[in-house]
Amino acid sequence: MKIEARAPTRIDLAGGTLDIWPLYLFHEGAQTVNCAITRYASCRIETHRGPGITLVSRDTRRSETFASLTALARARRYRLPLLAHLVRYFQPRSGFTLTTNSEAPAGAGIGGSSAMAVAICAAL
């Protein structure tokens, strides 16, 4: 089975990071204004027989493979921590390859990691 999902990144128009802890503790009632842009984070899951899990990030050119979900959960460090932690949370029942790609440059401040998390959650 193949599942694909994507989510747009965003830009801040006003309010910047006032919605992030601990800043919102000091600015009661603070609001932010954002809008989605056409730079997407996307993921594809391809299931296969067997328990193996492979995580691939095309834009960062990183990957890692685990013999099973148990092996992933027992790992102390990850090359792709966002992907690994989301897989641990959802605990899929079969083996698969999860491939991601982001059109947003790393560190650009346009919500690339959040958009990636949304896309992965939708696919899982």
Regions found by a protein language model. Name each.
Residues A115-L124:
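Stable alpha-helical structural segments in soluble proteins, enriched in small hydrophobic residues
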Residues M1-I110, A122-A123:
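ATP-binding N-lobe of GHMP and related small-molecule kinases
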